[in-house]
């Protein structure tokens, strides 16, 4: 039985808010058990997660979506299914690419040992080890380091390695080395899974300019919005604009780049501003003095559209995209104190996942913001995420929509 239901016909995402049909997630595996105090900064975590609780929290998040009929695809299952369906040559390339990209770099002897170890496992277990890391005890080799292959503990943030853009994808070059290997799985499934192999790529990690999915938004079928952030550069967005412009089948007419604070704990646009309904947006007031906007004209901007500074304030900019007056909801609500705004911004208070217009999922810990959303007519489906939030992401970070219904604007 395929990970995809019978309704899935390939990538189709033309909004942030259309009814969610198919979504990619990853329940944290053994990889989070290998986070140690000495490596917190390197692995991009604020604290060590309690693994059992983190998994229970993630299961609660997934249950909310499954209970509403959403086809929830687990990354491990998708990669394993793709591997079983792939040609012998594709399987070999997948394993060899993994070995070449492994951190730390493998000696020839360890490369041989890891290859044999992986190929001795059933497919699903093999993929789990590729994601979680491999110790010297599991491999049966002598080493000063316990880990022969490092873990990928950020994999539960499926938003970032690639993004669904219309009927295509952007597969990313991640800013930090610890996350770059994550795109191996996206590259493999989009080259080899029968349901995904024909998907056009608008960005390839071989382009080696940083961009991550938490910065990529599809506001409607004409406009992309991309963050200029701690993880994504304006020059990368310029290259993306050129790539999209060059594809004659793409409908998008405009890209808007939004500058946000370059904070390591709030690293993407979706930790500062998100779209939750046809005209309702949630934002952090902390970013007010940093917001700056550039326009890319994909219709009249020539073969290589360049960023044009747009001097509009946030509300007028959003109005120019959605063609109506936006409702701007600040984190914590209109009466929130600076401390309340700072606390709820820190725990990704803007990072909700819309599963229908005005129906969103997010952490229960951001109580002030949840109340403000309710007052603005947004329905919040809350879940407990005190452990998951230590990885610095909320529901949007932990999901990559693969298909949404089109919105009737």
Swiss-Prot record:
Pfam families: ADI (PF02274). The keyword Hydrolase applies. GO terms for molecular function: arginine deiminase activity. Keywords: Arginine metabolism, Cytoplasm, Hydrolase. It comes from the Bacteria. Its EC number is 3.5.3.6. Transmembrane segments: none annotated. One of its GO terms (biological process) is arginine catabolic process to ornithine. Its main location: cytoplasm. The active site is at residue 397. One of its GO terms (cellular component) is cytoplasm. Pathway: Amino-acid degradation; L-arginine degradation via ADI pathway; carbamoyl phosphate from L-arginine: step 1/2. It catalyses: L-arginine + H2O = L-citrulline + NH4(+). The keyword Ion transport does not apply. It is found in: Cytoplasm. Belongs to the arginine deiminase family. This is Arginine deiminase. It comes from Metamycoplasma hominis. The lineage of its organism: Bacteria, Bacillati, Mycoplasmatota, Mycoplasmoidales, Metamycoplasmataceae. The gene is arcA.
